[in-house]
């Protein structure tokens, strides 16, 4: 049983090792000029200064193509796959074995909806497959819905699921800040400060 959960965590990415990049400090003696020798000043080289390892050139992200003209304060944000272009994708899987289930989790990680048709699979394997994908969906904050006999819909958190009867799963909207009512009365603490000053 523990083996199934560890495989699920490995696939979803909860057990991924964090890799840190370490840089060696280099003496940048080429960047300093000898300030005490004024007799033979050397002209500055025409080529660009050597890059310091600590500072890298900014990398382009998927969102740079769309928002090239706008400069935002959050320049280090990397776009989610599928979020920039606004195109939603649905992956229909009809697996024959349990070994095909990681494809469904990977699609959910890429913010794609998954329709899982398990009519071909053995009932015990189908139950195991639904449990596996449901666990991955829960770990990714997604939603699941049974839409037929052995047919299931798994969606990422950015997808709203609804039927003719109403909304089954609604995408949470960020709470709007309530506007402060304009107060005509001065605050009570302001009067006390004036009394203290007198």
From Swiss-Prot:
Tagged with keyword Cell cycle: yes
Protein's job: Cell division protein that is part of the divisome complex and is recruited early to the Z-ring. Probably stimulates Z-ring formation, perhaps through the cross-linking of FtsZ protofilaments. Its function overlaps with FtsA.
Record-linked InterPro entries: Cell_div_SepF, Cell_div_SepF/SepF-rel, SepF-like_sf
Keyword Cell cycle listed: yes
Cross-referenced Pfam families: SepF
Cysteine-cysteine disulfides: none
Quaternary organization: Homodimer. Interacts with FtsZ.
Spans annotated as Disordered: 170-198
GO-annotated cellular components: cytoplasm
Keywords for this protein: Cell cycle, Cell division, Cytoplasm, Septation
Location relative to the cell: Cytoplasm
GO biological process, one term: FtsZ-dependent cytokinesis
Biased amino acid composition, Low complexity: 179-188
Protein name, UniProt field: Cell division protein SepF
Stated family: Belongs to the SepF family.
Matches recorded under Gene3D superfamilies: SepF-like protein
Chief location of this protein within or outside the cell: cytoplasm
């Amino acid at each position: 049983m523990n083996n199934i959960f560890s495989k699920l965590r490995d696939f979803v990415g909860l057990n991924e090792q964090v890799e840190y990049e370490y840089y060696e400090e280099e003496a940048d003696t080429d960047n300093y000029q000898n300030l005490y020798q004024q007799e033979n000043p050397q002209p500055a080289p025409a080529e660009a200064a050597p890059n310091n390892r600590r500072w890298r050139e900014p990398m382009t992200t998927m969102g740079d193509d769309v928002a090239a003209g706008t400069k935002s304060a959050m320049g280090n944000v990397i776009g989610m796959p599928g979020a920039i272009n606004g195109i939603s994708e649905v992956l229909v899987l009809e697996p024959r074995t349990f070994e095909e289930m990681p494809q469904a989790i990977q699609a959910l990680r890429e913010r794609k909806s998954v329709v899982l048709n398990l009519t071909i699979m053995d009932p015990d394997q189908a139950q195991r497959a639904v449990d596996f994908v449901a666990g991955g969906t829960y770990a990714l904050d997604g939603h699941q819905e049974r839409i037929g006999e052995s047919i299931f819909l798994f969606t990422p958190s950015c997808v709203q699921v609804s039927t003719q009867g109403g909304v089954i799963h609604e995408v949470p909207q960020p709470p709007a800040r309530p506007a402060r009512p304009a107060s005509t009365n001065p605050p009570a603490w302001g009067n006390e400060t004036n009394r203290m000053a007198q």
